[in-house]
Amino acid sequence: NNPDGPKYPAGLEEKDLNKTVTRTITYVYEDGTPVMENGAPKVVTQEAKFTREAKVNLVTGEVTYGDWSEAKDLAEVKSPVVKGFVADKATVPTTKVTADSKDATEVVTYKPLGSWVPNIPGQPTNPIKYPNDPTDPTKPGTEKPKAPYVPGFTPKDKDGNPLKPVNPNNSEEGYEVPNLPTDPSQDTPINY
């Protein structure tokens, strides 16, 4: 019988035996404003929880810790497609974390997609936004609209090359737009 009772030293609290590592993914526009989803900023929070055991020497009060539970994977998170914008990352990749890993924050940034810009003399410009790729948030889509037909004008690309009519027998059906630039956030002029 121990009349003084066992010695329970410091170091056996919940925080000494449990640890959580968090990865927070935020989605923002170039100017820093958050991408909204259902009326709130879109944020993905992933957590990995780790535990370990402790043994107490009841005579000396010394605490010895076991190893933290094994490493865990925080799953890959696909970036959403945001209409009219391109993301700088298609995914935030899977990452392995241990109890010693620091909390992390990942930011996915969206830039506005550019437009085909018909420059028609005497008319206001009416830009045609590049389409989104429905599955890859980092790329524009492949569907192409038509450049408008304007009587008396032949539309040209930025290098002065005439655009091809959609229907070679009837240019009134419009013209094939030029290919997109390497950076899909840049506009493509169509000069008349």
State where each predicted segment sits.
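Extracellular modular ligand-binding repeats in secreted and cell-surface proteins
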Residues: 1-192
